[in-house]
Design a protein with these regions (language model features):
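Short acidic/His/Gly/Ser-rich catalytic and metal-binding motifs that mark active-site loops
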Residues: 1, 68-71, 207-208
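FAD-binding core/adjacent interface of flavoenzyme oxidoreductases
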Residues: 26-108, 198
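Rossmann-like dinucleotide/flavin-binding elements
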Residues: 84-139, 190-191, 202-208
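Structural alpha-helical scaffold elements that stabilize or flank donor/cofactor-binding regions
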Residues: 23, 52, 190-191
Length: 208
């Protein structure tokens, strides 16, 4: 939940991360750093790559979700998925370095839910601080009729008005079908120039 704050430079990277070692010490838990390669429900064991299996009575799986990159042509090569967060933080740092060397920037956020709205506003706040950029173009693209469809109509109108006041180009009722190195193509035939394309669409459980 602190990722938008990190992008907007409200928080440092350290503040956005949880120190697992200290957390485990505090909770009298054991921290094991390894890859899980299987689960044996019959024997009630978690199979690890480099260690002996771990027995369990109850197993909680908290690996997070992944975006489906197969539905959009070029998404695997040219999009920036919002999940997993650990990878995104590294990508954000690279993007910020590129932005500091630019005088024009075009960014698109694909997904009109709360996560997409948070992200687009955080990016906008960050870009306002970069004095070297002369031209900023930010797009928010959603296939829905409204932004933040889980919210009530009043909230949706307030969000849309705030985005427009901040000169963010909002595209509704259209769907991204292709992402290229410097462009986005939509189902309705729009070709949008966009250098950095963030994917904040619904996530699925990991394929494993």
């Amino acid at each position: 939940g602190m990722l938008p704050g990190y992008i907007a430079e409200t928080y440092t990277k350290t503040q956005t991360q949880i120190d697992l070692l200290n957390l485990c010490k505090f909770s009298n838990s054991r921290l094991i750093v390894d890859n899980v390669i299987g689960i044996d429900p019959t024997e009630k064991q978690v199979i690890l790559k480099d260690r002996m299996p771990i027995k369990f009575d109850t197993l909680s799986i908290n690996t997070g979700g992944e975006p489906n990159l197969d539905n959009i042509k070029g998404a695997k090569e040219f999009s920036i998925p919002i999940k997993p967060i650990s990878k995104l933080v590294k990508v954000i740092d690279d993007i910020k370095r590129k932005i500091l060397q630019s005088n024009e920037i075009s960014i698109s956020v694909i997904g009109g839910g709360a996560g997409g709205i948070e992200l687009v506003l955080a990016l906008n706040e960050y870009l306002k601080t970069i004095k070297s950029i002369k031209k900023i173009k930010i797009n928010l693209i959603s296939r829905g009729k409204y932004l933040a469809q889980a919210k009530n109509k009043f909230s949706q109108n307030c969000i849309l008005s705030f985005l427009k006041d901040n000169k963010i180009n909002v595209i509704l009722k259209d769907e991204v079908v292709e992402i290229g190195p410097n462009f986005i193509k939509t189902l309705k035939g729009r070709i949008i120039n966009s250098e950095f394309n963030f994917l904040v669409t619904p996530i699925s459980p990991p394929k494993w």
